[in-house]
């Protein structure tokens, strides 16, 4: 049986830590999601970048449709789902998207230099909103991947291993 490749929660404590982090910041979470600090399209770009790194099939499907609804072009979405930043991406969002990719690749433990660069490009409330959005999508990704891992184990490797083919845009 081939080993399960995607990132999952390794313990209930890790899962609970993420949930507590988000619950303790409910007001800031609401502000991050209301579209005033971070536009809906920007939020969906961030979520799709993290989802691409973590490879969650459930989040990919949902957030591609949300990104389409937010007005992101099919061409840009194709690039995002390939781990690339499109030339159609608003220039002021690129630093955050590159940071989000690094953040996800480092399993939410970014190096200090990219954190400082993020703070140079965005206000403190925007940086907080970006981090909350990244934490939310990471939690969703790991929940989805952990569910797939359970399917994989229960089915002796028949289900849950490979993410679904990337949706046609």
Predicted regions, residues:
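Hydrophobic alpha-helical segments
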Residues: 1-169
């Amino acid at each position: 049986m081939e080993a399960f490749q995607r990132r999952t929660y390794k313990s209930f404590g890790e899962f609970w830590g993420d949930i507590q982090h988000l619950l303790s910041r409910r007001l800031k979470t609401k502000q991050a999601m209301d579209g005033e600090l971070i536009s809906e399209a920007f939020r969906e770009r961030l979520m799709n970048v993290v989802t691409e790194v973590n490879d969650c099939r459930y989040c990919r499907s949902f957030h591609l449709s949300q990104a389409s609804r937010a007005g992101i072009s099919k061409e840009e979405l194709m690039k995002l789902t390939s781990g690339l930043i499109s030339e159609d991406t608003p220039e002021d969002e690129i630093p955050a998207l590159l940071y989000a990719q690094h953040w996800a690749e480092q399993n939410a433990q970014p190096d200090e230099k990219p954190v400082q660069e993020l703070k140079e490009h965005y206000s403190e409330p925007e940086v907080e909103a970006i981090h909350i959005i990244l934490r939310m999508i990471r939690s969703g990704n790991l929940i989805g991947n952990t569910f797939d891992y359970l399917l994989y184990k229960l089915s002796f490797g028949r289900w849950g291993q490979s993410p679904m083919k990337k949706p046609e845009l």
